[in-house]
Design a protein with these regions (language model features):
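Functional transmembrane or membrane-interface alpha-helices that line membrane-embedded catalytic
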Residues: 3, 31-58, 62-65, 100-140, ...
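Membrane-water interface of alpha-helical transmembrane segments
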Residues: 4-11, 40, 75-78, 115-118, ...
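Alpha-helical transmembrane segments and their immediate juxtamembrane interface regions
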Residues: 155-183
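Charged, amphipathic alpha-helical linkers/stalks
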Residues: 149, 174-208
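Helix-coil boundary and interhelical linker segments in multi-pass alpha-helical membrane proteins
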Residues: 1-7, 61-79
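Hydrophobic, lipid-facing residues on alpha-helical transmembrane segments of integral membrane proteins
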Residues: 10-26, 47-55, 59, 63, ...
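Membrane-interface helix termini and inter-helical loops of multi-pass transporters
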Residues: 65-71, 142-149
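Conserved small/polar residues in nucleotide/adenosyl-binding loops
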Residues: 213-214
Length: 215
């Protein structure tokens, strides 16, 4: 992998982590009629989506992009089954690690049939497969074109800024999860500032999703 390709991979991790957070907020607003700031972190980001898409791009990208030699229906099949397997594994491993580290579940499929530990279930695996088709066959090719025009220096700065914010949020959220944030006033202030921003986005995205769903 070239340096430029690595920079793009990091960039797309943050792009899809943010888009995943938006999807989670919209889904929660539509299904529960409540505005819920989803995710483990305080900022508007769900890293598990970024991880899933990064792996899918690396593994499935050359088979699902329009430039591949396969027919369109083959692209769709590869994206569906490959994406379903990858996202299910990411969800299982990610959910298990988070539960073991923080003794908290950020999603629970225990109410669905044939679930495994509440971390994965066939119903959502199928949904992830459909979502993978949309992302790999439609969304990612569209995003790849403008992102390819980003100069290397700009891409470096974007990755550094997003990476710094992500690392700070990760540390603050981990401290909060183990219950130390109350003893560290500055950490708690930083957490609240991050949460305020993502709460504002939650209201915008959740309200918009409900309006679109009911219109």
């Amino acid at each position: 992998m070239t340096t430029y390709a690595l920079l793009h991979t990091i960039f797309f991790f943050f792009v899809y982590a943010f888009l995943g957070w938006c999807v989670e907020v919209a889904y929660a607003a539509i299904t529960t009629r409540e505005l819920v700031n989803r995710g483990f972190l305080n900022g508007p980001i769900c890293p598990i989506y970024g991880c899933g898409m990064t792996v899918m791009i690396a593994v499935l990208g050359r088979f699902t992009m329009p430039s591949s030699d396969m027919a369109w229906y083959q692209n769709v099949l590869v994206a569906f089954f490959g994406g379903m397997v990858i996202t299910t594994l990411v969800e299982l491993v990610g959910g298990y690690i988070l539960y073991k580290m923080f003794h908290t579940r950020w999603w629970d499929y225990s109410m669905y049939r044939f679930n495994l530990g509440g971390f994965i279930c066939p119903r959502f695996s199928l949904l992830w497969g459909l979502g993978s088709v949309l992302l790999m066959v439609v969304v990612h090719p569209l995003l790849s074109k403008p992102s390819a025009a980003i100069p290397t220096l700009v891409l470096i700065w974007l990755d550094v800024i997003f990476g710094g914010l992500f690392l700070a949020d990760l540390i603050v959220s981990a401290i909060q999860a183990v219950g130390f944030s109350k003893q560290l006033a500055r950490i708690d202030e930083l957490r609240k500032a991050m949460r305020t921003t993502s709460d504002a986005l939650t209201e915008v995205i959740g309200t918009s999703a409900c309006l679109l769903y009911t219109s």
